[in-house]
Protein backbone atom coordinates (compact mmCIF):
# COMPACT_ATOMS: atom_id res chain seq x y z
CA UNK A 1 0.00 0.00 0.00
CA UNK A 2 2.78 2.44 0.90
CA UNK A 3 4.53 1.58 -2.35
CA UNK A 4 1.43 2.55 -4.38
CA UNK A 5 1.13 5.81 -2.44
CA UNK A 6 4.71 6.79 -3.29
CA UNK A 7 4.24 5.73 -6.93
CA UNK A 8 1.14 7.90 -7.17
CA UNK A 9 2.92 10.86 -5.59
CA UNK A 10 5.87 10.39 -7.93
CA UNK A 11 3.54 10.19 -10.95
CA UNK A 12 1.74 13.37 -9.94
CA UNK A 13 5.05 15.16 -9.34
CA UNK A 14 6.38 14.02 -12.72
CA UNK A 15 3.24 15.23 -14.52
CA UNK A 16 3.55 18.59 -12.76
CA UNK A 17 7.20 18.96 -13.75
CA UNK A 18 6.47 18.06 -17.38
CA UNK A 19 3.54 20.50 -17.46
CA UNK A 20 5.70 23.24 -15.96
CA UNK A 21 8.44 22.63 -18.52
CA UNK A 22 5.88 22.75 -21.34
CA UNK A 23 4.41 26.01 -20.05
CA UNK A 24 7.90 27.44 -19.61
CA UNK A 25 8.81 26.39 -23.18
CA UNK A 26 5.66 27.99 -24.55
CA UNK A 27 6.24 31.21 -22.62
CA UNK A 28 9.91 31.18 -23.56
CA UNK A 29 9.02 31.21 -27.25
CA UNK A 30 6.64 34.17 -26.95
CA UNK A 31 8.36 36.75 -24.78
CA UNK A 32 9.28 40.20 -26.11
CA UNK A 33 12.93 39.16 -25.96
CA UNK A 34 12.22 36.06 -28.09
CA UNK A 35 10.64 38.20 -30.80
CA UNK A 36 13.51 40.70 -30.64
CA UNK A 37 16.18 37.98 -30.71
CA UNK A 38 14.60 36.22 -33.69
CA UNK A 39 14.38 39.48 -35.64
CA UNK A 40 17.90 40.52 -34.73
CA UNK A 41 19.39 37.19 -35.78
CA UNK A 42 17.94 37.70 -39.27
CA UNK A 43 19.01 41.34 -39.38
CA UNK A 44 22.53 40.55 -38.23
CA UNK A 45 22.89 38.00 -41.03
CA UNK A 46 22.57 40.86 -43.56
CA UNK A 47 24.49 43.46 -41.50
CA UNK A 48 21.41 45.41 -40.46
CA UNK A 49 21.27 46.99 -37.00
CA UNK A 50 19.05 45.61 -34.26
CA UNK A 51 15.43 46.25 -33.42
CA UNK A 52 14.21 47.02 -29.92
CA UNK A 53 10.91 46.25 -28.25
CA UNK A 54 8.60 49.25 -28.11
CA UNK A 55 5.73 49.05 -25.65
CA UNK A 56 3.51 51.47 -27.60
CA UNK A 57 3.94 49.39 -30.78
CA UNK A 58 3.28 46.26 -28.72
CA UNK A 59 0.09 47.80 -27.29
CA UNK A 60 -1.16 48.37 -30.83
CA UNK A 61 -0.22 44.78 -31.75
CA UNK A 62 -2.09 43.41 -28.72
CA UNK A 63 -5.19 45.45 -29.48
CA UNK A 64 -5.20 44.37 -33.12
CA UNK A 65 -4.55 40.71 -32.31
CA UNK A 66 -7.46 40.74 -29.86
CA UNK A 67 -9.71 42.20 -32.55
CA UNK A 68 -8.89 39.22 -34.82
CA UNK A 69 -9.57 36.57 -32.16
CA UNK A 70 -13.17 36.16 -33.33
CA UNK A 71 -12.31 34.90 -36.80
CA UNK A 72 -8.50 34.57 -36.92
CA UNK A 73 -8.44 35.86 -40.50
CA UNK A 74 -5.15 37.16 -41.87
CA UNK A 75 -6.39 40.67 -42.52
CA UNK A 76 -3.94 43.55 -42.14
CA UNK A 77 -4.84 46.39 -39.81
CA UNK A 78 -4.19 49.01 -42.49
CA UNK A 79 -2.70 51.41 -39.93
CA UNK A 80 -0.16 53.53 -41.85
CA UNK A 81 1.92 54.14 -38.72
CA UNK A 82 3.23 50.57 -38.75
CA UNK A 83 4.61 47.87 -40.95
CA UNK A 84 2.97 44.54 -40.20
CA UNK A 85 3.59 40.82 -40.51
CA UNK A 86 0.83 38.33 -39.70
CA UNK A 87 0.89 34.59 -39.06
CA UNK A 88 -1.76 31.95 -38.46
CA UNK A 89 -1.44 28.42 -37.15
CA UNK A 90 -3.99 25.70 -36.60
CA UNK A 91 -3.58 22.16 -35.32
CA UNK A 92 -0.39 23.02 -33.42
CA UNK A 93 0.78 25.68 -31.00
CA UNK A 94 2.20 28.46 -33.15
CA UNK A 95 4.77 30.39 -31.15
CA UNK A 96 6.13 33.84 -31.82
CA UNK A 97 9.48 32.30 -32.65
CA UNK A 98 7.77 29.98 -35.19
CA UNK A 99 6.13 32.97 -36.85
CA UNK A 100 9.35 34.95 -37.18
CA UNK A 101 11.14 31.85 -38.48
CA UNK A 102 8.43 31.43 -41.17
CA UNK A 103 8.85 35.04 -42.26
CA UNK A 104 12.63 34.79 -42.29
CA UNK A 105 12.47 31.57 -44.36
CA UNK A 106 11.28 33.76 -47.25
CA UNK A 107 14.89 35.02 -47.58
CA UNK A 108 15.44 32.07 -49.92
CA UNK A 109 12.96 33.68 -52.32
CA UNK A 110 14.42 37.21 -52.10
CA UNK A 111 17.09 38.39 -54.53
CA UNK A 112 18.92 41.36 -52.99
CA UNK A 113 20.69 42.11 -56.29
CA UNK A 114 17.43 42.79 -58.10
CA UNK A 115 15.35 43.62 -55.00
CA UNK A 116 12.68 41.17 -56.15
CA UNK A 117 11.02 37.97 -55.03
CA UNK A 118 11.40 34.78 -57.04
CA UNK A 119 8.60 34.38 -59.60
CA UNK A 120 5.41 33.23 -57.92
CA UNK A 121 6.91 33.57 -54.44
CA UNK A 122 6.30 35.88 -51.49
CA UNK A 123 9.17 37.57 -49.67
CA UNK A 124 7.68 40.76 -48.23
CA UNK A 125 7.47 39.34 -44.71
CA UNK A 126 11.21 38.75 -44.80
CA UNK A 127 12.00 42.19 -46.18
CA UNK A 128 9.94 43.79 -43.40
CA UNK A 129 11.86 41.80 -40.77
CA UNK A 130 15.19 43.07 -42.13
CA UNK A 131 14.03 46.57 -43.21
CA UNK A 132 16.91 48.79 -42.09
CA UNK A 133 14.81 51.74 -40.94
CA UNK A 134 12.24 49.68 -39.00
CA UNK A 135 13.96 49.72 -35.62
CA UNK A 136 11.10 49.34 -33.11
CA UNK A 137 8.83 46.32 -32.92
CA UNK A 138 5.87 45.10 -30.93
CA UNK A 139 4.25 41.71 -31.35
CA UNK A 140 1.25 39.88 -29.95
CA UNK A 141 -0.20 36.38 -30.04
CA UNK A 142 -3.79 35.31 -29.36
CA UNK A 143 -5.68 32.05 -29.29
CA UNK A 144 -8.66 32.50 -31.56
CA UNK A 145 -12.19 31.35 -30.81
CA UNK A 146 -11.71 28.48 -33.29
CA UNK A 147 -8.61 27.25 -31.41
CA UNK A 148 -6.11 28.54 -33.97
CA UNK A 149 -3.31 31.01 -33.21
CA UNK A 150 -2.95 34.53 -34.62
CA UNK A 151 0.31 36.46 -34.39
CA UNK A 152 1.10 39.99 -35.46
CA UNK A 153 4.37 41.87 -35.37
CA UNK A 154 4.24 45.58 -36.03
CA UNK A 155 7.18 47.73 -37.08
CA UNK A 156 8.00 51.38 -36.61
CA UNK A 157 8.74 53.14 -38.76
CA UNK A 158 7.10 50.94 -41.40
CA UNK A 159 9.07 49.40 -44.23
CA UNK A 160 8.48 47.65 -47.54
CA UNK A 161 8.28 50.78 -49.67
CA UNK A 162 8.03 50.00 -53.37
CA UNK A 163 11.30 50.54 -55.19
CA UNK A 164 13.34 50.81 -51.98
CA UNK A 165 15.76 48.18 -50.77
CA UNK A 166 15.44 46.77 -47.26
CA UNK A 167 19.19 47.00 -46.63
From Swiss-Prot:
<dbReference type="InterPro" id="IPR014044">
    <property type="entry name" value="CAP_dom"/>
</dbReference>
<keyword id="KW-1015">Disulfide bond</keyword>
<dbReference type="InterPro" id="IPR018244">
    <property type="entry name" value="Allrgn_V5/Tpx1_CS"/>
</dbReference>
<dbReference type="InterPro" id="IPR035940">
    <property type="entry name" value="CAP_sf"/>
</dbReference>
<keyword id="KW-0611">Plant defense</keyword>
<dbReference type="GO" id="GO:0005576">
    <property type="term" value="C:extracellular region"/>
</dbReference>
<feature type="disulfide bond">
    <location>
        <begin position="117"/>
        <end position="123"/>
    </location>
</feature>
<protein>
    <recommendedName>
        <fullName>Pathogenesis-related protein PR-1 type</fullName>
    </recommendedName>
</protein>
<comment type="function">
    <text>Probably involved in the defense reaction of plants against pathogens.</text>
</comment>
<dbReference type="Pfam" id="PF00188">
    <property type="entry name" value="CAP"/>
</dbReference>
<feature type="disulfide bond">
    <location>
        <begin position="72"/>
        <end position="144"/>
    </location>
</feature>
<feature type="domain" description="SCP">
    <location>
        <begin position="36"/>
        <end position="155"/>
    </location>
</feature>
<dbReference type="GO" id="GO:0006952">
    <property type="term" value="P:defense response"/>
</dbReference>
<dbReference type="InterPro" id="IPR001283">
    <property type="entry name" value="CRISP-related"/>
</dbReference>
<comment type="similarity">
    <text>Belongs to the CRISP family.</text>
</comment>
<keyword id="KW-0568">Pathogenesis-related protein</keyword>
<keyword id="KW-0732">Signal</keyword>
<feature type="disulfide bond">
    <location>
        <begin position="139"/>
        <end position="153"/>
    </location>
</feature>
<feature type="signal peptide">
    <location>
        <begin position="1"/>
        <end position="29"/>
    </location>
</feature>
